[in-house]
Amino acid sequence: MISTKELRNKFISYFESKNHSHQPSSSLIPFGDDTLLFTNAGMVQFKDVFLGLEKRDFSRAVTVQKCLRAGGKHNDLDNVGYTARHHTFFEMLGNFSFGDYFKKDAISFAWEFLTKEIKLPVEKLWVTIYATDDEAFDVWHNHIGLPKERIIRIDSNDNFWSMGDTGPCGPCTEIFYDHGEDVAGGLPGTPDEDGDRYIEIWNIVFMQFNRHADGTVTDLPKPSVDTGMGLERIAAVLQDVHSNYDIDLFQALIKKAQEVTNADDINSPSLKVVADHIRSCAFLIADGVLPSNEGRGYVLRRIIRRAIRHGNKLGAKDIFFYKLVAELINQMGEAYPQLIDKRELIEKTLIKEEELFLKTIENGIKIFDTEIVSLKSDIISGEIAFRLYDTYGFPLDLTADMAREKGLKVDEEAFKEQMLKQKQRSKEAGKFNVDYNSIINSQAKSDFRGYSTLIEDAKVLEIYQDGQPVNAIQAGSTAVIVLDRTPFYAESGGQVGDKGVLEGVGVEFIVEDVQKSGEAILHIGKLSKGILNTYDEVTARVNDSVRLATAANHSATHLLHKVLKIILGSHAEQKGSLVDDNKLRFDFTHDKAISRVEIEQIETLVNQQIRANYPVATIETSQEKAKSLGAEALFGEKYGDIVRVISMGDFSIELCGGTHVAYTGDIGLFKIVSESGIASGIRRIEAITANKAIKYTFATENKLAAIKEITKSNDSNLLDKLQSMLEQLKNQEKEIAKLKKDILSGANSDIKESSIDGIKLIIANLEGVDIKTLREKIDDYKSKNDKMVAVLSTINADKVQFVIGVSKSITSLIKAGDIAKEFSGYIDGKGGGRPDMAQGGGNNSTNIDKALSDLENHISINIKK
């Protein structure tokens, strides 16, 4: 029997023998593609190649791609554990042609691999083609020799693939394996096609057309091929089992799950859930995702909590999920070394998340069980589901899972309404970023010269206004300029774009931002004088002070990243950064606030590397060579075959395309100005360098000097002096509070109290108190009187403040808010509140006595009505 490990290696070796370049799996987090939550197919890392936006050094590729389907449109989570072939995480075997071979070779490679390399019986294989794809039929029938009756034409979207509403598209051919007559199910295209007898094992997509916005389709100049074969599916075929969960890899994980949960039934769907979910959770964490309440982090949290619930159901009474990581590494660590490298982070993250959820899961399940007893239908309300989510941390799919086991359903639409209301309550304005790739379709190529120069003579290739190409612009126009060569760095890798100017004869274009679109570098800004035409010659001049300040901050992030790993631990991985000329912002994984001592250690070690004045060296080399040098690749970045390596002595080596100083000493000084948490397990450091750090230090020293002058202290006694002053202030505040209380007690004799129809009426203006004291006095009156109206005011610096209290039992007769509005009219102020409590104030204190007298009459009249 061929193992899953052997099958993975055999696939790669076969296509390498056919001159395919073996490319590593890309991250589960798609780089630069906001349309996808997770990588869900092998072609995702080559999307820009297929679109013509990116070029590679090879025309044939083979990959084993990590894929995840557990969120958004592509979501298999609900079915996992209950079917033979649904998974959250799976591996996709794929071979690709970028304008190289086409249908004949693609089909021939697939057939040879299946029938010669892994020796599947020919008589077990069937194929489908798109209904009108006669070329594919000819290859299958006349070249491969497959009988006509085993080639099925399908006239549906199942055999025609497209990347979207527009763009590359084309027919596909699928290869099916026949499990035999003892398994239910019919051929593709028949009413029984959803059975398990005929299983699709390989899909080969022929990208030969380009679909336009008007719906028309034209031929692509260089047709391409995209194929995919699920590793788990083909392993099940080769190991002669009908369920993916019966293959060697899953059986090892299921047995381990049974061991750590004390489960009785090895065939329990819950064991399959746990075995599946450890793969997706471990790989997501290894790729930089941490549990949170939004986005990818929330999908991870949902999967973890679903696994915990199923483990709880199996009999696990304590944390168990992290115990599967060792077996996962045993099964997949050789193919994916990042599992080994990130083992500590994976296990710690799972332990922390499980401990968090175990605090609420038992109570949540009790609430669920209590609620379903009183149900009058088979529908659990959206309100109940939302309560479980909001109070007990139960994701919707977990509640739906529990409901399905009881033969119930959840009103998901009502749940979504509750979620929408919550989002509206906490809605925050989001930052709007322009996606120039989506509005500017430039085919130009700009040659970036900015690593070695800040000034370059160039030619204007294209001009865009409002996303549309134009031939010329007038002074005052905002536009996007594309040059044939440029020293301007385009925003990338967390570093903002350069600023500067494009100058010509009588022409000046102020560059405010720089972005990329494909291979074009976009200079975004405003023409301040002259007329600029396409093909004009200009001098591109980068603002050197901005560039140098930005470079200092960028180089400092490299030092900071390495120092964080030394001080905090190897888990401190970069999660994001922003570098401009003012500051640097660095986000990283760490599960608690950084102490003042650690801040000092970090600053000290970074500044030691600055003073060491290491040369900042740059080399371009292959990814493999870079890894052998110990270069650190950053999460979320996309790298080509040839990468740029930035080294700072032997201290820091990273892959980076940004701009840097020549020596670490050029950074000058590094100073952290803030440290905070931005999400669960994610911390943020903001820091400054060079002149800004020096100015910040001077400003801080000046403030300290001012404090010493005000407090009449020096360096040796400043802290003691401040502590003494704080103690003195606290004592004085206590004395003031006591004096106010005494004043109020003394004023009680001046407070006018009367009774009208059994309702106590209290009215007074009290001197020397604040509004807080008035509120406390009102609360005291209300606690002692069931039927009472109290109006208390005070005057401070000619400003009137008042508080009105009314017992709740009589608010039908008179309301505090109404009295407040009337009171405000006497004092040129404003006031309002609830029926039982209101307050207000004004600037005119001359009428206070008349106001209180008139209010007494007004209240009496209303009570007697």
From Swiss-Prot:
Gene3D superfamilies: 2.40.30.130, 3.10.310.40, 3.30.54.20, 6.10.250.550, Bira Bifunctional Protein, Domain 2 (3.30.930.10), Threonyl-trna Synthetase, Chain A, domain 2 (3.30.980.10). It holds the Pfam family tRNA_SAD. Its cofactor is Zn(2+). It is an enzyme of class 6 (ligase). It catalyses: tRNA(Ala) + L-alanine + ATP = L-alanyl-tRNA(Ala) + AMP + diphosphate. One of its GO terms (biological process) is alanyl-tRNA aminoacylation. It is found in: Cytoplasm. Binds 1 zinc ion per subunit. PROSITE patterns: AA_TRNA_LIGASE_II_ALA (PS50860). One of its GO terms (molecular function) is aminoacyl-tRNA deacylase activity. GO terms for cellular component: cytosol. Zn(2+) binds at residues 554, 558, 656, 660. Its EC number is 6.1.1.7. InterPro entries: aa-tRNA-synth_II/BPL/LPL, Ala-tRNA-lgiase_IIc, Ala-tRNA-ligase_IIc_anticod-bd, Ala-tRNA-synth_IIc_core, Ala-tRNA-synth_IIc_N, Ala-tRNA_ligase, Ala_tRNA_ligase_euk/bac, DHHA1_dom. Keywords: Aminoacyl-tRNA synthetase, ATP-binding, Cytoplasm, Ligase, Metal-binding, Nucleotide-binding, Protein biosynthesis, RNA-binding, tRNA-binding, Zinc. PANTHER family: ALANINE--TRNA LIGASE, CYTOPLASMIC, ALANYL-TRNA SYNTHETASE. Catalyzes the attachment of alanine to tRNA(Ala) in a two-step reaction: alanine is first activated by ATP to form Ala-AMP and then transferred to the acceptor end of tRNA(Ala). Also edits incorrectly charged Ser-tRNA(Ala) and Gly-tRNA(Ala) via its editing domain. Consists of three domains; the N-terminal catalytic domain, the editing domain and the C-terminal C-Ala domain. The editing domain removes incorrectly charged amino acids, while the C-Ala domain, along with tRNA(Ala), serves as a bridge to cooperatively bring together the editing and aminoacylation centers thus stimulating deacylation of misacylated tRNAs. Belongs to the class-II aminoacyl-tRNA synthetase family. This is Alanine--tRNA ligase. The lineage of its organism: Bacteria, Pseudomonadati, Pseudomonadota, Gammaproteobacteria, Thiotrichales. The gene is alaS.
